[in-house]
Amino acid sequence: DLVMLPCYHWTRCLLVPKGHPLEALERVDIEDLARFPLVTYTFGFTGRSELDSAFSRAGLEPHIVFTAIDADVIKTYVRMGLGVGVIASMAIDEKEDTDLVKLDARHLFQSSTTKICFRRGIFLRAYMYDFMSLFAPHLTRDMVDKALTMKTQYDVDMLFSDVELPVR
């Protein structure tokens, strides 16, 4: 039984080499994206299920040619011309990735939420509380302790429903 505490939301972007046909579009839609091979995260890791859901909602099937658990591997595949990358927007390094073009995909895919999880009933040491509050400032010791008193994950989610999480 896990307690899952929300930390921040994150969004996806598309990554293409300079000169790619998608770069010329003012706004990429899901039908445009479906015309190209995709390189993205492994299913069940880092929000891949949201990509599949977005295509499913449009009645389309994504053409995924490679998957990886690491954004840098995906960037390498994009650089090799193997497909359009679909990665977390925060994985782009403005200094290192100057050969690639980042295209907004917030309108295509719902954001995901990064959470800190731990087993219910675990003894949380002071350094664990410290880490949580450093990683996500709204996860104060009081809030974490309140979450621990909740009986269900739904109750935990409701506890944090008024907290405005940052977007990264």
What is each of the regions a protein language model found here?
Residues D1-T11, L25-E26, D72-G121:
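Beta-alpha-beta core module
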Residues L2-L38:
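Flexible hinge/capping segments at coil-to-helix
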Residues L15, T40-Y41, T67, G85, ...:
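Active-site-adjacent beta-strand anchor residues
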Residues A24-L25, T42, S49-E50, A126:
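Residues that form or flank phosphate/diphosphate-binding pockets in enzymes
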Residues G44-V101, K151-R168:
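Hydrophobic hinge/microswitch elements
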Residues S89-D97, H107-R168:
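C-terminal effector-binding regulatory domain of bacterial HTH transcription factors
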